[in-house]
């Protein structure tokens, strides 16, 4: 796998977390992107803090929409959570998978750490596999 696009609804939490963790583990060996189906106005600050606790950085991330060309060309599209819907173009080259990750909203830092650890485990398995 040379490239991956992580997607969630807002691109302010889960997909940014996954991208930051993937960058931490893969450094420059994999091209890493994140996007949202309905981009938020900003990053979820609990996500930023929880990712920093494990040595990754998403503080400079900016929520953005899915780039259709990127969707067509990446090797893997990973949807985080059950709410985001992605229509893959017929010409898409990569595989699509969904990770059922719990929603952290309004649950506080303890819940965010659980979500972070779920994402962390899945990212490591993805990069190893």
From Swiss-Prot:
SMART domains per UniProt: LMWPc
Protein EC: 2.8.4.2
GO MF annotation terms: mycothiol-arsenate ligase activity
Key words, A-Z: Arsenical resistance, Cytoplasm, Transferase
A biological process from GO: response to arsenic-containing substance
Catalysed reactions, as listed in the record: mycothiol + arsenate = arseno-mycothiol + H2O
Main localization (coarse): cytoplasm
Record GO cellular component, one term: cytoplasm
Membrane-traversing stretches: none
PANTHER family given in the database record: ARSENATE REDUCTASE (PTHR43428:SF1)
Record's function text: Involved in defense against toxic arsenate. Involved in the mycothiol/myoredoxin redox pathway which uses a mycothioltransferase mechanism; facilitates adduct formation between arsenate and mycothiol.
Family the entry assigns: Belongs to the low molecular weight phosphotyrosine protein phosphatase family.
Protein name stated in the entry: Arsenate-mycothiol transferase ArsC2
Organism: Corynebacterium glutamicum (strain ATCC 13032 / DSM 20300 / JCM 1318 / BCRC 11384 / CCUG 27702 / LMG 3730 / NBRC 12168 / NCIMB 10025 / NRRL B-2784 / 534)
